[in-house]
Amino acid sequence: MVEVGGGAAEAAAGRRWRLADERCDLRAAETEYVRRFHRHEPRDHQCSSAVAKHIKAPVHLVWSLVRRFDQPQLFKPFVSRCEMKGNIEIGSVREVNVKSGLPATRSTERLELLDDNEHILSVRFVGGDHRLKNYSSILTVHPEVIDGRPGTLVIESFVVDVPEGNTKDETCYFVEALLKCNLKSLAEVSERLVVKDQTEPLDR
């Protein structure tokens, strides 16, 4: 886990947040992505953090899954059902049902930003029976090369209220664990699709 500073002003104000990854070092490009796209301003009663995942699949494939605001169950293992009316556009609201075993059953979520050029997805929780109040996330998708092949770096950051009775660290660790599961599943689904595409006959 790496501590990432949010700039001199934020450091002076005592605001620090982490970027959690399987690796303990960040390349300059990754740090630049965080600085450029993942700008949160947590208040005293909030915490903010991020997770990253390197996926052995091209950006266009990974983004095609991520951008489906209407079908988060494509790669999110804790989602059992999702309903959304209308087209996928900024302001769209989805009703998500959560699988049993988690301290929640449903979540109402609004699409804040969907940028197909920069590959940015931002979502805010606006209701539900969970404890993630004022939760807002930013997910970005970036091209990279892994083992000489097209790959993808996915970074997801968030800010959320710290529930009464919990610490900032406890809240961050809980949310980070959920996001890591989501990104691990995203990697598995994406990489399976790559293998499938490579093994399908050319005359299909």
Curated annotation (Swiss-Prot):
Keyword tags: Abscisic acid signaling pathway, Cytoplasm, Disulfide bond, Nucleus, Protein phosphatase inhibitor, Receptor, Stress response
CDD domains membership: PYR_PYL_RCAR_like (cd07821)
Site (Involved in interactions with PP2Cs) residue list: P103, T167
SUPFAM superfamilies per UniProt: Bet v1-like
Motif Latch loop location, chain numbering: 130-132
Binding residues for abscisate: 76, 104-109, 131-137, 156
Disulfide pattern: C47-C172
Induction (UniProt): Repressed by abscisic acid (ABA).
Function description: Involved in abscisic acid (ABA) signaling during seed germination and abiotic stress response. Acts as a positive regulator of ABA-mediated inhibition of seed germination, and tolerance to drought and cold stresses. Together with PP2C50 and SAPK10, may form an ABA signaling module involved in stress response. Inhibits the protein phosphatases PP2C06 and PP2C09 when activated by abscisic acid (ABA).
Any further remark recorded for this protein: Plants overexpressing PYL3 exhibit abscisic acid (ABA) hypersensitive phenotype during seed germination. Plants overexpressing PYL3 exhibit tolerance to cold and drought stresses.
The protein's assembly and partners: Monomer. Interacts with PP2C50. Binding to PP2C50 is dependent on the presence of abscisic acid (ABA). Interacts with PP2C30 and PP2C53.
PANTHER family: ABSCISIC ACID RECEPTOR PYL3, OS08G0374000 PROTEIN-RELATED
Protein name: Abscisic acid receptor PYL3
